[in-house]
Amino acid sequence: MRTVLVALLALVALTQAISPLDLIKEEWHTYKLQHRKNYANEVEERFRMKIFNENRHKIAKHNQLFAQGKVSYKLGLNKYADMLHHEFKETMNGYNHTLRQLMRERTGLVGATYIPPAHVTVPKSVDWREHGAVTGVKDQGHCGSCWAFSSTGALEGQHFRKAGVLVSLSEQNLVDCSTKYGNNGCNGGLMDNAFRYIKDNGGIDTEKSYPYEGIDDSCHFNKATIGATDTGFVDIPEGDEEKMKKAVATMGPVSVAIDASHESFQLYSEGVYNEPECDEQNLDHGVLVVGYGTDESGMDYWLVKNSWGTTWGEQGYIKMARNQNNQCGIATASSYPTV
């Protein structure tokens, strides 16, 4: 009995001897292993650890509010938790809303206007993953090619609805080959430009035949390995969430642009993302709406597929607030290709 007591006292003493700094270092070590982080030198690692620790405190503070029911989503130490926020935005967010407006003014090229079907009652919730119309979550890496992933996702869904086969399409094909249409590879682009390129090009290659590299490369499109094509695209009326809901329900996954410029988006983990600071015109990131619904608390949301891998958000997805005055501009620039 005395031996057991001594052992317990020793364990307590050891626990008390572990400093907060030791715990942070252990958490940092686990984080690096989990996300396969490697840094150029010790100076960079110290810099990244400092950012990680600052984000760690921000996340803990925010998640206390979540536990108290004051916010509707949680944050987490994902693979971007060691990046400065401005560094993250410059690297990951590649949608150029200003370019979209300029191109429309200069060229007059717009898609067909979406007209919702008459006398159709849409379901209260939709998830196109359940119908087999959505490929697995992909990862754009450190390349501002979000627009390409949003484009392929929408066309993958439309091709599935028409042909009954889900084919993963090549984002790299769009990155390398659609510059003449106003896209800039890893430096950003537009989904509508991608749809125009695919139409004029006679198709887009499969991901298998033209795999993703995450860099700007020369175009090596091969018409022998085309996976899908489109005949144009449809623009959903700007800011109209109800029409976008009908489009998602009746037509399939929809390409959208959003304001993802906030730290809360960078570190999002789970729940319904409700960010009052979002701007409906400051659009900087292309994603894919694959459904919609209402959570247990009665909060409406859009089900959104991102292109940052499965370790971000809810296995690569985010639920974004719906019917909150077009929050984050989710219905400002929405479209889908026609096939």
UniProtKB/Swiss-Prot annotation:
Coiled-coil positions: none
PROSITE patterns named in the record: THIOL_PROTEASE_ASN, THIOL_PROTEASE_CYS, THIOL_PROTEASE_HIS
Catalytic residues of the enzyme: C146, H285, N306
Propeptide, residue positions: 18-121, 295-298
Glycosylated residues (UniProt): N96
Alphabetical UniProt keywords: Developmental protein, Differentiation, Disulfide bond, Glycoprotein, Hydrolase, Lysosome, Protease, Signal, Thiol protease, Zymogen
Signal peptide location: 1-17
GO BP, one annotated term: proteolysis
Main location group: other
Disulfide bond annotation, renumbered to this chain: C143-C186, C177-C219, C278-C328
GO molecular function: cysteine-type endopeptidase activity
Pfam families, per database record: Inhibitor_I29, Peptidase_C1
Subcellular location: Lysosome
GO CC annotation terms, alphabetical: lysosome
Reaction catalysis annotation: Specificity close to that of papain. As compared to cathepsin B, cathepsin L exhibits higher activity toward protein substrates, but has little activity on Z-Arg-Arg-NHMec, and no peptidyl-dipeptidase activity
EC number(s) stated in the UniProt entry for this protein: 3.4.22.15
Subunit structure: Dimer of a heavy and a light chain linked by disulfide bonds.
Sequence similarity: Belongs to the peptidase C1 family.
Protein task: Important for the overall degradation of proteins in lysosomes. Required for differentiation of imaginal disks.
Protein name, UniProt field: Cathepsin L
Species for this entry: Sarcophaga peregrina (Flesh fly)
